[in-house]
A protein has these predicted regions:
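Single conserved hydrophobic/aromatic residue that forms the stacking wall/gate
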Residues: 1-19
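Divalent-metal (Mg2+/Mn2+/Ca2+)-assisted nucleotide/phosphate chemistry catalytic cores
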Residues: 16-24, 29
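Short acidic, glycine/serine/threonine-rich loops at helix termini
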Residues: 16-17, 53-55, 83-88, 132-135
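Active-site-facing alpha/beta catalytic cores
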Residues: 16-17, 115-140
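Conserved C-terminal portion of the radical SAM core fold
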Residues: 26-85, 95-125
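Hydrophobic alpha-helical scaffolding
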Residues: 45-48, 90-97, 178-181, 219, ...
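Short secondary-structure boundary/capping segments
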Residues: 58, 87-93, 135-138, 258-260
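Radical SAM enzyme core and accessory elements
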Residues: 130-305
Length: 305
């Protein structure tokens, strides 16, 4: 009388002889498909390995499991500076991102015409790297791949814009600071400027933090460490409080990835820190200095915010 949902992690690799066979993985997925168990997938795109024709083949292979397989995301490989002795991967560049987006958007049209949903999605990072406009909200199929960094920025924009439309605005005086990763910085800057149109006396200092701990190629806020945050914000104007996204901390803890704590940051920077939940309404409320009654809908993921 109920349909069981089970999460499986199936690695599909076919570019190295000493790792799992893609045929074996597809056979396992075939069993899930025949059992009617819903699936969602992720492809980590590595330039020169599984892009181009290989990406087309992957999408085609996984697409035959539709509609039981509901979606797949394509995300760029994340490379830290700690790669001595590892396979010589290179980071995804602008041209790589452009090609991947073009491929994925062609496939989206095919799947939408056949099934009524887009199935394959490029992560937000591809659009930022390519310098392209984010897809419209409808193309995210209800944000089914949100936890893999697909649609986070679009959802944030939509939620903040909705909160802005519902706000009356006033002349309250307030000075705050916001720290984030380099990837979401321009979007948060634009949204903050929008908020300040109705609250012109709110002054916001916005700081994109460079990730020296893991490497400058890591640009998401969820992998920023306490030492990078403190080192780059020390001596900067921070106002009456510093806003940090919840995903900058370990889940359920006030601890950064490098074991520094919220209290360490407050003590070093001499400013109260407000950990902001994930939704656009939470962000809006934090900027204007309001707390909303009841629980807010929040989501967490390290990829973007």
């Amino acid at each position: 009388f109920f349909k069981q949902k089970t999460a499986y992690e199936i690695c599909v690799c076919d570019w190295s002889s000493d790792v799992c066979s893609s045929d074996l993985a597809l056979k396992k997925m075939e069993k899930l498909y025949r059992a009617g168990i819903e699936m969602n997938g992720q492809v980590v795109l590595c330039a020169g390995l599984n892009d181009g024709e290989e990406l087309d083949r992957t999408i085609r292979d996984l697409g035959r499991f539709c509609p039981v397989m509901q979606s797949m995301s394509v995300v760029p490989v994340g490379l830290t500076k700690y790669r001595d002795g590892l396979y010589p991967l290179r980071p995804i560049e602008k041209e790589d991102a452009e090609r991947a987006i073009d491929q994925i958007e062609r496939w989206q049209k095919i799947f939408y015409e056949k099934y009524g949903f887009h199935f394959v999605h490029a992560s937000d990072e591809f659009y930022v790297l390519a310098g392209r406009t984010l897809p419209e909200e409808e193309r995210y199929d209800g944000y089914i791949q949100l936890e893999n960094g697909v649609g986070m920025l679009r959802l944030l924009i939509e939620e903040v814009t909705e909160a802005y439309k519902n706000a009356k605005g006033d002349l309250r005086q307030r000075e705050i600071s916001i720290a984030t990763g380099k990837l979401p910085y321009p979007f948060l800057r634009e949204l903050t400027d929008l908020i300040c149109e109705k609250f012109p006396n709110i002054r916001v200092h916005m700081y994109p933090v460079t990730n020296y701990f893991f490497g400058e190629k890591i640009t998401v806020s969820g992998l920023i460490t306490g030492q990078d945050l403190i080192g780059q914000l020390a001596g900067q104007p921070l106002g009456q409080e510093l806003l940090l996204p919840v995903n900058m901390f370990r889940s359920g803890e006030n601890v950064f990835l490098d074991d520094l704590t919220l209290e360490d940051a407050q003590r070093a920077l001499q400013v109260p820190v407000n950990i902001v939940k994930s939704s656009g309404q939470d962000f809006f409320n934090a900027v204007v200095g309001e707390e909303k009654d009841g629980e807010e809908t929040s989501w967490q993921c390290y990829e973007i915010r």
